[in-house]
Amino acid sequence: MSRYRGPRLRIIRRLQNLPGLTNKLVESKKNKVSGSDQSIQKKVSQYGIRLEAKQRLRFNYGLTERQLLNYVRIARCAKGSTGQILLQLLEMRLDNILFRLGFVPTIPSARQLINHRHILVNNRIVDVPSFHCKPKDIITIGSPKTYQSILTKRIESFAKDQVPEHLTLSLSEPKKPKGFVNYLINRESIGLKINELLVVEYYSRKA
Protein backbone atom coordinates (compact mmCIF):
# COMPACT_ATOMS: atom_id res chain seq x y z
CA MET A 1 0.00 0.00 0.00
CA SER A 2 1.45 3.38 -1.03
CA ARG A 3 1.72 6.47 1.14
CA TYR A 4 -1.51 8.50 1.34
CA ARG A 5 -1.41 11.72 -0.69
CA GLY A 6 -5.08 12.73 -0.62
CA PRO A 7 -6.96 15.37 1.41
CA ARG A 8 -5.63 15.48 4.98
CA LEU A 9 -8.81 16.86 6.55
CA ARG A 10 -10.71 13.80 5.38
CA ILE A 11 -8.29 11.63 7.34
CA ILE A 12 -8.38 13.59 10.59
CA ARG A 13 -12.17 13.83 10.51
CA ARG A 14 -12.19 10.05 10.51
CA LEU A 15 -9.21 9.34 12.77
CA GLN A 16 -9.24 12.48 14.95
CA ASN A 17 -6.42 15.01 15.18
CA LEU A 18 -3.00 13.86 13.99
CA PRO A 19 -0.33 16.49 14.77
CA GLY A 20 2.26 14.99 12.43
CA LEU A 21 -0.09 15.06 9.43
CA THR A 22 -1.56 18.54 9.80
CA ASN A 23 -1.68 21.31 12.38
CA LYS A 24 -5.33 22.00 11.63
CA LEU A 25 -7.84 20.91 14.24
CA VAL A 26 -11.25 19.62 13.23
CA GLU A 27 -14.14 17.98 15.01
CA SER A 28 -14.22 14.28 14.26
CA LYS A 29 -17.26 12.66 12.69
CA LYS A 30 -17.76 10.68 15.89
CA ASN A 31 -18.46 13.88 17.81
CA LYS A 32 -20.98 15.11 15.23
CA VAL A 33 -23.42 12.23 15.56
CA SER A 34 -26.86 13.60 16.45
CA GLY A 35 -29.02 12.21 19.22
CA SER A 36 -31.33 10.45 16.77
CA ASP A 37 -28.38 8.76 15.08
CA GLN A 38 -26.71 7.53 18.26
CA SER A 39 -29.25 4.78 18.75
CA ILE A 40 -28.52 3.26 15.35
CA GLN A 41 -24.74 3.45 15.55
CA LYS A 42 -23.10 0.09 15.09
CA LYS A 43 -20.96 -1.21 17.89
CA VAL A 44 -17.31 -1.09 16.86
CA SER A 45 -15.61 -4.48 16.95
CA GLN A 46 -12.28 -5.10 18.65
CA TYR A 47 -10.77 -5.50 15.20
CA GLY A 48 -12.17 -2.10 14.22
CA ILE A 49 -10.65 -0.47 17.31
CA ARG A 50 -7.24 -1.98 16.57
CA LEU A 51 -7.48 -1.05 12.90
CA GLU A 52 -8.23 2.57 13.79
CA ALA A 53 -5.23 2.72 16.15
CA LYS A 54 -3.01 1.31 13.42
CA GLN A 55 -4.32 3.82 10.89
CA ARG A 56 -3.76 6.71 13.31
CA LEU A 57 -0.15 5.66 13.76
CA ARG A 58 0.44 5.13 10.04
CA PHE A 59 -1.07 8.41 8.89
CA ASN A 60 0.47 10.51 11.65
CA TYR A 61 4.00 9.40 10.77
CA GLY A 62 3.33 9.23 7.02
CA LEU A 63 4.17 5.56 6.55
CA THR A 64 3.15 2.97 4.01
CA GLU A 65 1.59 -0.24 5.29
CA ARG A 66 4.77 -2.15 4.48
CA GLN A 67 6.96 0.37 6.32
CA LEU A 68 4.86 0.17 9.47
CA LEU A 69 4.83 -3.63 9.36
CA ASN A 70 8.62 -3.64 9.08
CA TYR A 71 8.90 -1.37 12.11
CA VAL A 72 6.63 -3.70 14.09
CA ARG A 73 8.84 -6.65 13.15
CA ILE A 74 11.96 -4.80 14.28
CA ALA A 75 10.28 -3.85 17.56
CA ARG A 76 9.27 -7.47 18.18
CA CYS A 77 12.89 -8.60 17.86
CA ALA A 78 14.18 -6.01 20.33
CA LYS A 79 14.28 -6.37 24.10
CA GLY A 80 11.57 -4.54 26.02
CA SER A 81 7.98 -3.49 25.40
CA THR A 82 7.18 -3.99 21.70
CA GLY A 83 4.72 -1.09 21.65
CA GLN A 84 7.06 1.39 23.29
CA ILE A 85 9.99 0.36 21.12
CA LEU A 86 7.76 0.79 18.05
CA LEU A 87 6.90 4.35 19.07
CA GLN A 88 10.54 5.06 19.82
CA LEU A 89 11.59 3.88 16.35
CA LEU A 90 9.03 6.15 14.70
CA GLU A 91 9.82 9.16 16.88
CA MET A 92 13.55 8.92 16.19
CA ARG A 93 13.10 9.13 12.41
CA LEU A 94 14.76 12.22 10.97
CA ASP A 95 11.52 13.58 9.48
CA ASN A 96 9.82 13.38 12.87
CA ILE A 97 12.82 14.88 14.69
CA LEU A 98 12.63 17.95 12.42
CA PHE A 99 8.93 18.22 13.19
CA ARG A 100 9.40 17.90 16.96
CA LEU A 101 12.20 20.50 16.93
CA GLY A 102 9.82 22.97 15.29
CA PHE A 103 11.76 23.34 12.04
CA VAL A 104 8.59 22.50 10.09
CA PRO A 105 4.83 22.48 10.84
CA THR A 106 4.22 18.87 9.75
CA ILE A 107 6.06 15.64 9.01
CA PRO A 108 5.27 15.83 5.25
CA SER A 109 6.96 19.26 5.24
CA ALA A 110 10.01 17.73 6.91
CA ARG A 111 10.11 14.94 4.36
CA GLN A 112 10.17 17.50 1.55
CA LEU A 113 13.16 19.33 3.06
CA ILE A 114 15.03 16.06 3.49
CA ASN A 115 14.28 14.83 -0.02
CA HIS A 116 15.58 18.13 -1.42
CA ARG A 117 18.87 17.57 0.42
CA HIS A 118 18.54 20.60 2.69
CA ILE A 119 19.16 18.74 5.96
CA LEU A 120 22.50 17.82 7.48
CA VAL A 121 23.14 15.36 10.29
CA ASN A 122 26.58 15.75 11.84
CA ASN A 123 27.56 17.98 8.88
CA ARG A 124 26.61 15.36 6.30
CA ILE A 125 23.66 15.65 3.93
CA VAL A 126 20.96 13.10 4.67
CA ASP A 127 18.21 12.68 2.07
CA VAL A 128 16.43 9.71 3.63
CA PRO A 129 13.40 10.69 5.78
CA SER A 130 13.51 7.37 7.65
CA PHE A 131 17.10 7.97 8.81
CA HIS A 132 17.31 6.85 12.45
CA CYS A 133 18.68 9.61 14.68
CA LYS A 134 20.84 8.70 17.66
CA PRO A 135 21.96 10.45 20.85
CA LYS A 136 24.58 13.17 20.20
CA ASP A 137 23.40 13.70 16.60
CA ILE A 138 23.37 17.35 15.48
CA ILE A 139 20.78 18.43 12.90
CA THR A 140 21.31 21.59 10.85
CA ILE A 141 19.99 23.29 7.70
CA GLY A 142 22.02 22.96 4.52
CA SER A 143 22.23 26.63 3.55
CA PRO A 144 21.31 30.07 4.97
CA LYS A 145 19.12 30.76 1.92
CA THR A 146 17.04 27.70 2.64
CA TYR A 147 16.62 28.79 6.22
CA GLN A 148 15.69 32.35 5.30
CA SER A 149 13.09 31.41 2.72
CA ILE A 150 11.43 28.50 4.48
CA LEU A 151 12.13 28.45 8.18
CA THR A 152 12.68 31.96 9.57
CA LYS A 153 9.12 32.69 10.67
CA ARG A 154 8.52 29.12 11.76
CA ILE A 155 11.55 28.91 14.06
CA GLU A 156 11.06 32.37 15.58
CA SER A 157 7.41 31.71 16.40
CA PHE A 158 8.05 28.24 17.79
CA ALA A 159 8.31 28.25 21.59
CA LYS A 160 11.39 26.42 22.82
CA ASP A 161 9.37 24.96 25.69
CA GLN A 162 7.44 22.97 23.08
CA VAL A 163 10.55 20.95 22.27
CA PRO A 164 10.51 17.58 24.08
CA GLU A 165 13.21 16.87 26.65
CA HIS A 166 15.12 14.38 24.51
CA LEU A 167 15.85 17.17 22.02
CA THR A 168 17.40 20.63 22.27
CA LEU A 169 16.81 23.54 19.89
CA SER A 170 19.64 26.07 19.72
CA LEU A 171 19.14 29.53 18.21
CA SER A 172 22.39 30.99 19.53
CA GLU A 173 23.78 31.62 16.04
CA PRO A 174 21.72 34.00 13.86
CA LYS A 175 19.99 32.18 11.01
CA LYS A 176 21.73 28.92 11.90
CA PRO A 177 19.36 26.86 14.03
CA LYS A 178 20.67 23.58 15.41
CA GLY A 179 18.88 20.58 16.79
CA PHE A 180 20.55 18.24 19.26
CA VAL A 181 19.46 14.71 20.12
CA ASN A 182 20.10 14.29 23.84
CA TYR A 183 18.89 10.73 24.31
CA LEU A 184 16.34 8.22 23.02
CA ILE A 185 12.80 9.39 23.58
CA ASN A 186 10.77 7.97 26.47
CA ARG A 187 7.06 7.12 26.44
CA GLU A 188 6.00 10.32 28.22
CA SER A 189 7.39 12.50 25.42
CA ILE A 190 5.59 10.80 22.52
CA GLY A 191 3.77 13.44 20.50
CA LEU A 192 0.77 11.34 19.45
CA LYS A 193 -1.98 10.25 21.83
CA ILE A 194 -2.38 6.57 21.08
CA ASN A 195 -2.65 3.15 22.69
CA GLU A 196 0.29 1.42 21.04
CA LEU A 197 -0.77 -1.99 22.41
CA LEU A 198 -3.74 -1.94 20.04
CA VAL A 199 -1.34 -1.58 17.11
CA VAL A 200 0.79 -4.48 18.34
CA GLU A 201 -2.34 -6.61 18.74
CA TYR A 202 -3.47 -5.71 15.21
CA TYR A 203 -0.20 -7.05 13.80
CA SER A 204 -0.01 -10.05 16.14
CA ARG A 205 -0.72 -12.48 13.30
CA LYS A 206 1.18 -10.60 10.62
CA ALA A 207 4.49 -9.63 12.20
From Swiss-Prot:
Underlying gene: rps4
Organism classification: Eukaryota, Viridiplantae, Streptophyta, Embryophyta, Tracheophyta
Protein name: Small ribosomal subunit protein uS4c
GO molecular function, one term: rRNA binding
Recorded superkingdom: Eukaryota
Family as reported in the entry's similarity comment: Belongs to the universal ribosomal protein uS4 family.
GO cellular component, one term: chloroplast
Purpose: One of the primary rRNA binding proteins, it binds directly to 16S rRNA where it nucleates assembly of the body of the 30S subunit. With S5 and S12 plays an important role in translational accuracy.
Keyword Ribonucleoprotein: yes
Organism: Equisetum variegatum
Residue span(s) of domain S4 RNA-binding: 92-150
